[in-house]
Structures are given as C-alpha cells and as structure tokens.
Amino acid sequence: RDGYGFVLLANQCKNHVRLGDLADIWQPSRLTGYTMPDGKGLPFFTAGQVFEDFPRVRKWLAAPFVPQADTRYVKQDWLLLSCSGVVGNITAVYPHHLDKIITHDLLRIVPKDANEYGWLYAYMKTNFFKQIAQAAQYGHMIKHIEVSHASEFPIIMPENDVRKTIGETARRAVLLRSKSWKMRDEAFSTLEKHVGACRDSATQSQTANQGEVSLAAILQNRLRLDADSFVGAIKDVDELINACDWDYLGNLTSDVVEPTRFKRFYGESDVPFV
C-alpha cells in the first residue's frame, strides 16, 4: 500500500514524533439518538455535514437520550479527524460547528501546546498525512481508525522557525475562513430582512400550505405532476421574488456557458479532474 510507504518514510525522519505526543486524542461513545421534530431537541451534525461548506441542521435529537451530551460538543481550538468510511480527512472547528452535537465518527484532536495548532492543522491537511492515515495497518482495509491508531501517526517536525511560519499562516487562514462564514451569515440575514423572508418559513409552509393530490387522478388523466406547485416552501419563495425588484441571470452576467461533454481517459497525468 502506498500509505505504508509514507509511514516508513516519515518514521525514518530524525525529527518526527507521534501525533499522540502533540495532542490529546479521544472519541465520544457511540451515539444512538432518537430524533425529534425540526427545531426541537439538540441539533446534530453527521461527519459529512461537518465537512460541508454550508451545513444545515437536518436532525434534532431528544436530549434525555443523548448520554454525556457535554462530551459531544466541540471547541474552536480543536481539530476533527474522520475515522470511519472515508478516513483521514481533517477539519478545523468553525463557528457553525459550535453548540451542535457532533457525531462520534470524528476523532477529537486537542493540541497539547496551542502554539502547535497551526502546524498540526497544516500538516494533517496534506495528502502526505492522508496517505499515512489510510495506510493498511491504520485501518485502510476496514475503513476505520481507532484512537490508538491515530496516536501512532508520525508527525514530521521541521525547525521551530519553519513550523512557526507555516503554523501562523494556517491559523490565519482558519480565522479568516471563520470571519467569512460570519460575514456570509450577516449577508443572508440582510437579504432575508430585505425580502421579508423567515428562516423558519420553510418548515411552517410545508405544514400549512402543503397540498394533497390523488395519484390515481393524475395517472387516469395522463397529467404531469409538477411538484413545485404543491410545495409550500417553493410557493413562498416565488411570492417573495415576485414582490421584489428582480431580473434574469442572463441580464446580470456577461455570459452563461455550459461546457460540452467530453470523453475522459484516466491515467497518470499532471491534469487533475474534479
């Protein structure tokens, strides 16, 4: 496995330490929660949602059935490492992760020295580290990383000046990203205030304006079911737009282009494909 070769390479470096030497690593107990109606209970994020750019709470858990709930929240000076499924992905903790119940499928990485936070984040974001995390002896075959595995991950430690420079840049990137998310939330709030939208309107509309149509009536008359016409949230959005000044996207942009389809041939190349 390629990852195992990276492990050997890192362990050959004289200036390497174990991840467990630099951080406390732990994992909450497995959680089997009971869901509640939207807006009631404790907001919950899955591992996938934690890595989303714009996550939305889709599941709310009944508080009495969340054991040791205080251990399932995260702090902004921590790192989170995916340990199940697609292992080895790392993320910083951002403002929208706070005050949410976070799945046990993410290991909590708590730096022992705050000065090493930036270096740890930068190093663990590299493809080099991800290959290490996915190495066979660390669970690549079973797609799972235990706390004991993560503690043994080799971390290369260059000179203090190098780590400080890279670490400060990484920390600044995290702070600026956090600021950008806050500014985006403010922009959305301003837009909602301007058009008179309410963030809870979608939930209210689905219960208040949702229509019911007989499938037999549709099939009998060979009609086409346009779901937009029967979803209250969509109708609300249409009404909000019609009540405001608006214009077509084509009139507001210089061009709208859709590239043609092309046949892809995969192989060794310097051209990445997304």
Q: Which functions belong to the PLM regions below?
A:
Residues 1-31, 159-260:
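Non-catalytic DNA-recognition/assembly elements of restriction-modification systems
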Residues 20, 32-66, 238-242, 250-253, ...:
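DNA target-recognition patches
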Residues 99-107, 138-161:
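A short glycine-rich beta-alpha junction/loop motif
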